[in-house]
Amino acid sequence: MELAELTVRGFTEEIASASPAPGGGSAAALAGAVGAALTAMVSGLTLGRKKYEAVQELALRAQAQADALRKRLLAAMEQDTQTFLQVSAAYAMPKQTPEEKQARSSAIEQGLKACTQPPLAVMQLCAEGLELLESLLGKTNATAASDFGVACLSLRAGMQGAWLNVCINTGSLHDTVFAAGARAAGQKLLDTGLPRADRCYAEMLAACSEK
C-alpha cells in the first residue's frame, strides 16, 4: 500500500517506527500536501459568496491549481521513500573485493543523486503553492484567515523540510558539480518562497488578531 493510501494514524505509526523510511522527506511532502489542501479549502470557501463575486474566477482557478499540487505532493511522499530504499540497498551491497567496492560506490552515488530529486520536486511544488497563496492575499473569505495562515506555514515547512533532505543527500556526493547544481536550485526556491511565506503569514496573523 502506498503511503498516501494509509490512514493518518497508520502513516504516523510508520513514521514512529524504528525503520528509517518513511521519514522526514515523506513527512515534508505531506506537510506541503496539507498546505495545498488548505489553499483549495480557502478558495472553495470564497466561491459562491456575493461579497467575493469579483474574484470568483480567480478562486475557482486557485482551487483547481491547489488540488493539483496536493495530488503531486502526495505522490512525492512515496517517491521519497522509494528512492531512500534504493540507496539503502546500495549501502548494503558487498564490499569484499575491489570490484565489489567499485560497484557499491557507484550504486551509492547514483542512489544519492536519485534521492535528491524528490525533495527538490517537493520544494518546487511548495514554492508554487506559496506563489498561489500570495496571489490570493486579500481576495479570499476573511473568515478563513487562520486556515490561510496554516496553509502558508505548512507549505513553508514542506519546503524547508525538503531542503534539509537535499542538503544531506548532496553532502555525501562525490560529484560536486551535481551537488552544487542541486543546492543552487534549492536555494533559489528558498530565496523566493520564504519571503512569500513571511508576507502571507504576517498578513494572516494581523487579520486573525483584528477579530
Q: How should these model regions be labeled?
A:
Residues L3-P22:
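Short, hydrophobic/aliphatic alpha-helical segments
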Residues Q79-P94, A197-K211:
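Long, charge-rich low-complexity segments
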Residues D80, F84-L153, A157, N169:
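Amphipathic alpha-helical interface segments
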Residues S17-A40, A144-A162:
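Conserved phosphate/anionic-ligand binding catalytic regions in large, soluble enzymes, centered on
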Residues V122, G129-L132, A144-M204, E210-K211:
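Preference for long, well-ordered alpha-helical segments
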Residues L30-V34, A62, L69-A76, G111, ...:
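Amphipathic alpha-helix face/heptad-repeat signature
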Residues M41-E53:
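Transmembrane signal-anchor/signal-peptide helices with a preference for the extracytoplasmic
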Residues K50-A89, L189:
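A structural-propensity feature for long, helix-poor, extended segments
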